[in-house]
């Protein structure tokens, strides 16, 4: 449960004794791995009980616990290793994309759609949620228009719906293997972002409500909810404050 993808993405390894084969240099970057809620889920196709289904309204892939008999076909067939077999309940479990929050069931947002728990709790503000088929969505801009957010291992053929902005400091060949042939192009755009791209990046982690559309102004970006109500307003360029010498945290 803790690390089903261990060593799948890592580049470092122990040096063998006796003889030494050519190995690439060690590097590290953090890659959060969650269920991709694929358009063509391998887990769904593999389940002999038809216990896995994809919700048409939002694309969330779920396991019907009442139908699952613990055959573990989904565990075997998912290329991302996200369904896991629970030894206590004897059924498979996986990320549910916090669908209750998407439905507006959380009282914190007064019935408005809310982002998932992993997004709202992320202190690094590295995640953003939205609908990729809506041209007004910031996610649509990142994936379809600017093409800086790419799917993980697109060669698996499941059409995953979690997208990543590739890191700049990892070897390019490795990134092409993970994110496809557009990895270098995405890094180039992200390294020197346009005004609109920089604005959209400021929406990451800026609100717990789902941002359906946005508007970019000269100095700030505004995020709107489903009914075009404003849910967040953030500056595009964060102010830099230089502290006086007597307040510097140095010895």
Language model feature labels by segment:
Residues 1-251:
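Non-ligating segments of multi-cofactor redox enzymes
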């Amino acid at each position: 449960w803790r690390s089903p993808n261990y060593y799948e993405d890592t580049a470092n390894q122990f040096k063998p004794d006796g003889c030494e084969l050519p190995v690439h240099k060690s590097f590290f970057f953090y890659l959060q791995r969650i269920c991709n809620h694929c358009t063509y889920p391998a887990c769904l196709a593999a389940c002999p009980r038809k216990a896995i289904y994809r919700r048409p309204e939002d694309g969330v892939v779920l396991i019907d616990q009442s139908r699952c008999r613990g055959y573990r076909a989904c565990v075997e067939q998912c290329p991302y290793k996200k369904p896991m077999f629970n030894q206590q309940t004897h059924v498979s479990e996986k990320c549910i994309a916090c669908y209750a929050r998407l439905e507006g069931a959380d009282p914190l947002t007064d019935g408005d759609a809310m982002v998932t728990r992993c997004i709202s709790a992320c202190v690094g503000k590295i995640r953003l949620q939205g609908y990729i088929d809506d041209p007004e969505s910031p996610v649509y801009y990142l994936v379809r228009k600017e093409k800086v957010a790419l799917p993980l291992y697109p060669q698996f053929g499941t059409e995953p719906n979690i997208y990543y902005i590739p890191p700049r400091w990892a070897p390019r060949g490795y990134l092409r293997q993970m994110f496809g042939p557009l990895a270098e192009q995405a890094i180039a755009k992200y390294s020197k972002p346009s005004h609109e791209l920089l604005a959209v990046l400021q929406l990451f982690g800026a609100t717990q409500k789902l941002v359906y559309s946005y508007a970019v102004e000269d100095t700030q970006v505004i995020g709107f909810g489903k009914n075009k109500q404003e849910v967040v307003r953030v500056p595009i360029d964060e102010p830099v404050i230089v502290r006086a010498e007597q307040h510097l945290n140095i010895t």
